């Protein structure tokens, strides 16, 4: 599990309210204390400061899962389909993020990023990626030759590369907590250790038509409107208000290696492969971290638990749910060889090092150790397709006009979080008549 920086200034979060406590009634409750939930809560109070808003989170603190278990990259928006929400919100979110970091004095580094073609057959795909980046409005992207590659990254070898100077790194878990701090400073209230169990019609007060409940020993929340940003649990939370189970969240664990401290000089910037469209993930890469570490990887394997960060973290019910899903079975059939190779690279470090040596030939097996892991909430449809864009839903029934669910917010959701928050806030103000 990753080590996260403790944000000592943030002390005002409340634990779960006991049944005996009479809670205030809220204009809006937000479920999920990750980066999208916290950014959205903050943005709503920026635009509508008189609203009474609560944010509930099932863990003891904010940013425990995806928001605190990620590569820390600030993405430029290169990869994403032109016209998609991913492309639009990432490019917008990049600038909003740097503006926020500067204003709040949050440490970050503009390390840049190389996407490197090491074989001739990869060059046409790199050219297509360059065209896509330009269509998406990514700033200052360059196509560079092998000499420029070594000028930027002396130990990296390649034929051609895309150079993205505005790609950077930051501690997204810390950023999430800053969003939460700002939300509370503006009058919002955060309740942790509150796992959501029910979303119901509130029969007690028609002015607050939604009842949100947890453990029977905890108080219920009564609210006019509800937004859920539940990450790895997003499909299950959406189902509580009658939404379809599709797309389903299938958890994929990514396992990193660490470059030993005496070898950190080998890597200065983010180094990525040219993505292969035949496969569903980007491939192994080199990622500098704010603390000076260099992460190598990750692979991508099915997690045995929704929030399972190791091979020994297993939930039989979660695993059965993933394996019995028709979409997962179709994905396995389509990418069986790829999946076996990913599993093999996770078990045998030398296999992953061999992939990394394509970019830095002098890297050795003895230069690396096992590192941290994260779990990605990947939405998948019943046909076995990985859902590639953000998905929002409301479900059906009496309460559907009062509820918004964020069903899929994969990478680059952290980079895009402030732009996503603006979009959700605009939609909420219109739909909920706030």
From Swiss-Prot:
Coiled coil regions, renumbered to chain: none
Cofactor: FAD
Top enzyme class: oxidoreductase
Catalytic activity: (S)-2-hydroxyglutarate + A = 2-oxoglutarate + AH2
EC annotation from Swiss-Prot or TrEMBL: 1.1.99.2
Membrane-traversing stretches: none
One Pfam assignment: DAO
Subcellular location: Mitochondrion
Entry GO terms, CC: mitochondrion
The protein's name in its UniProt record: L-2-hydroxyglutarate dehydrogenase, mitochondrial
GO molecular function: 2-hydroxyglutarate dehydrogenase activity
KW Iron-sulfur (keyword) present: no
UniProt keywords, alphabetically: FAD, Flavoprotein, Mitochondrion, Oxidoreductase, Transit peptide
Similarity-based family: Belongs to the L2HGDH family.
């Amino acid at each position: 599990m990753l080590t996260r920086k403790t944000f000592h200034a943030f002390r005002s979060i409340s634990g779960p309210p006991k049944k005996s406590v009479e809670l205030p009634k809220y204009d809006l409750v937000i479920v999920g204390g990750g980066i999208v939930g916290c950014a959205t809560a903050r943005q709503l109070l920026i635009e509508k400061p008189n609203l009474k808003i609560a944010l509930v989170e099932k863990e003891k603190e904010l940013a425990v899962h995806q928001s605190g278990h990620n590569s820390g990259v600030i993405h430029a928006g290169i990869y994403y389909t032109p016209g998609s929400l991913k492309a639009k919100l990432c490019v917008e979110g990049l600038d909003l993020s740097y503006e926020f970091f500067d204003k709040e004095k949050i440490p970050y580094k503009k390390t840049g990023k190389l996407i490197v073609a090491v074989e001739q057959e990869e060059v046409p795909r790199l050219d297509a990626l360059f065209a896509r980046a330009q269509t998406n409005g990514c700033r200052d992207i360059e196509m560079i030759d092998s000499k420029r590659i070594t000028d930027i990254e002396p130990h990296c070898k390649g034929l051609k590369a895309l150079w993205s100077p505005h790609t950077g790194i930051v501690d997204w878990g810390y950023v999430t907590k800053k969003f939460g701090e700002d939300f509370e400073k503006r009058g919002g209230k955060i309740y942790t250790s509150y796992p959501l169990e029910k979303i119901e019609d509130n029969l007690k007060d028609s002015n607050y038509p939604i009842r949100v409940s947890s453990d029977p020993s905890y108080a219920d929340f009564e609210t006019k409107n509800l937004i859920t940003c539940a990450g790895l649990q997003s499909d299950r939370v959406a189902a509580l208000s009658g939404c379809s189970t599709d797309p389903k969240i299938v958890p994929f664990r990514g396992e990193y290696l660490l470059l030993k401290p005496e070898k950190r000089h080998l890597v200065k910037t983010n180094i990525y492969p040219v993505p292969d469209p035949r496969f569903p993930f980007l491939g192994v890469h080199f990622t500098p971290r704010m603390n000076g570490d260099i992460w190598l990887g990750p692979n991508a394997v099915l997690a045995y638990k929704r929030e399972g960060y190791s091979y020994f973290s297993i939930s039989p019910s979660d695993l059965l749910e993933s394996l019995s899903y028709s979409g997962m079975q179709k994905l396995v059939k389509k990418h069986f060889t790829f999946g076996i190779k990913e599993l093999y690279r996770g078990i045998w470090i030398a296999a992953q090092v061999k992939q990394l040596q394509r970019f830095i030939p002098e890297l050795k097996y003895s230069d690396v150790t096992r590192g941290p892991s994260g779990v990605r909430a990947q939405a998948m449809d019943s046909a076995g397709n990985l859902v590639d864009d953000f998905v929002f839903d409301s479900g059906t029934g009496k309460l559907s006009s009062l509820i918004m669910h964020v069903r899929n917010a994969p990478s680059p959701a952290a980079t895009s979080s402030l732009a996503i928050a603006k979009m959700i806030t605009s939609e909420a103000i219109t739909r909920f008549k706030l």
